Amino acid sequence: MLLNSNELEHIHSTNHSVNDISIRWGVIGAGQKGNKEADLFAGYKFSNGTTCYPTLAVNFAESDMMHLQNIIKEDRIHFDGLKGAARTPSVVTDLFDPETNPNANGYLDKLAQELGRKFTNEEGEVIVDQFLICLGAGGGVGTGWGSLVLQLIREQFFPCPVSMLISLPSGDPDEINNALVLLSEIDEFMREQDRLFGNSDIKPLANVIVNDNTQMQRIIESQKGTKDLKNRYVNWKEVANDNVVSTLHEINIIPENYGSDNVTYDPSDLIKLLSIPGRFLTIGKARIAKFDLHSLENSIKRSLDEGFFSAEHQFETATMYGGFVLRPSNADFFKDVNTENRIRNTLGEYKRLDEIAGKFGDPIWDNEYAVCYTIFAGMTMPKRYISLAREGKELAEKQEQLRAEAQRKQDEEKVDISFATNRVQKNTFNPYNKNQGFGGASRFSGGKNSAFKRQTSEATSTQNQQEEENIISTLKTSNPFKKR
């Protein structure tokens, strides 16, 4: 059983049984980043030992999945003959595009069969409420998979709504470009979805949750050496994954397993919040050890502005909110009217709560501190999109300047090697040729070739033919994943 947060350690160290969740996520991790997050979801188990989330990993580089600890080999989807996408999303999208690949439907059939095997029961019934797609926007497989998912939603491939968990890159121009294009495509999809579905309809693309690598690395660097991160060596990516995934798991198990003597936050409240808005969603998580209004307010603000889900969100565009304070049973501070008002007023600084739907509860647990989980949903594109575009442009301009400068220096320092070329071209000695004599036709007739030219043979290209013939092209009729 994976216990990768203080809260999960405490929950499972007590006699409190956890045998259900609010939303039955079917988790699919695409690309190296998505694989690692999905692997964490696969490690969560109920008190009875059964797995919380059915999970698949998808990757074009089989080696990227070798070190997964919780996803078994048969649940690691790899397409034969492919060895990665090299930060080129079109490798993914072209594979499933009938206009560019005549075998695209065969690949889609294989994907549908794998999803049907994992996410349906023996009667062919879907066993999940939502699909949670984890990916890194920037890599080839992750970015391409994000684009592919949008197209498959349009084709009604998925039998239930889809949520996306996306991490944004930092520092690499190619990855930033990929992320910007994917975010733009998501924004276009959301606008189209808004035209087709009403405010109270469950959306095919339920929500998109964004994590910013730059922000998460900054948090972990500031925490290194503190009581939260005592280790001498810290892999910030692993710590970030633990924080993001454990927070999502916590908000999913608490409403189902913890009640309140004041205001209960039901599983149905969470399901509604994560199903209807159809836009960007963010989560704030704040541990509260000092029970006073000032500490409470600052903790909530810090979790939203400087947390692991912070990405310069436009809170004023939110259409729903929700959350709860997981509090000690003897902490009457959280039931006090002034405390309730302070929480509402603090959230109201981000978005006037009387303008949007939502609910805030206060479930009880048997620990000494409290944890506040805050969710805003239905927001438009985060402003991080704008600043990321600015960073990408600056990096591209810097790269071009460096290339031009290097070319200029090379031109200035050009070396005359004509003497060497002349000597090499006149050298006719070959130790592997037998001496055939010096008579006969002129030895200098014919066209001139490079002195280093090698004998070449015609290449053949039949590598993928047999592999493509082995792909399953039909599905069982009970499979709910729609074929083209």
From Swiss-Prot:
Cellular localization per UniProt: Cytoplasm
Keyword check for Transmembrane: no
Binding site for Mg(2+): D64
Keywords assigned: Cytoplasm, GTP-binding, Hydrolase, Magnesium, Metal-binding, Nucleotide-binding, Plasmid, Plasmid partition
Annotated GO CC locations: cytoplasm
Family that this chain belongs to: Belongs to the FtsZ family. TubZ subfamily.
Induction info: Probably part of the tubR-tubZ operon.
Binding site for GTP: Q32, K33, G140, V141, G142, N213, K237, N241
Compositionally skewed regions (Polar residues) per UniProt: 452-484
Organism name: Bacillus thuringiensis subsp. israelensis
Catalysed reactions, as listed in the record: GTP + H2O = GDP + phosphate + H(+)
UniProt-listed InterPro entries: Tubulin/FtsZ_GTPase_sf, TubZ-like_C
Keyword Protease part of the UniProt annotation: no
Gene from which the chain derives: tubZ
Applied uses, from the record: A miniplasmid containing this and upstream gene tubR is able to replicate in B.thuringiensis subsp. israelensis and express insect toxin proteins. The miniplasmid could be used to make plasmids for insect toxin overexpression.
Cofactor: Mg(2+)
Free-text note on domains in this protein's UniProt record: Consists of two domains: a nucleotide-binding N-terminus that hydrolyzes GTP and a C-terminus domain necessary for polymerization. The domains are bridged by a long, central helix. The C-terminus is required for binding to the TubR-iteron DNA complex; its gradual deletion leads to decreasing binding to TubR-DNA. Interactions between the C-terminus and the following monomer drive polymerization. The C-terminus is required for filament formation. In the absence of GTP's gamma phosphate the intersubunit interface is weakened, linking GTP hydrolysis to treadmilling.
SUPFAM superfamilies linked to this entry: Tubulin nucleotide-binding domain-like (SSF52490)
A GO molecular-function descriptor: GTPase activity
Name of this protein: Tubulin-like protein TubZ
Region (Disordered), start-end ranges: 428-484
Knockout consequences: Loss of plasmid replication.
EC number: 3.6.5.-
Function: A tubulin-like, filament forming GTPase; the motor component of the type III plasmid partition system which ensures correct segregation of the pBtoxis plasmid. Filaments may seed from the centromere-like site (tubC) when bound by DNA-binding protein TubR; the tubC-TubR complex stabilizes the TubZ filament. Filaments grow at the plus end and depolymerize at the minus end, a process called treadmilling. TubR-tubC complexes track the depolymerizing minus end of the filament, probably pulling plasmid within the cell. Required for pBtoxis plasmid replication/partition.
Pfam families with a match to the protein in the record: TubZ-like_C
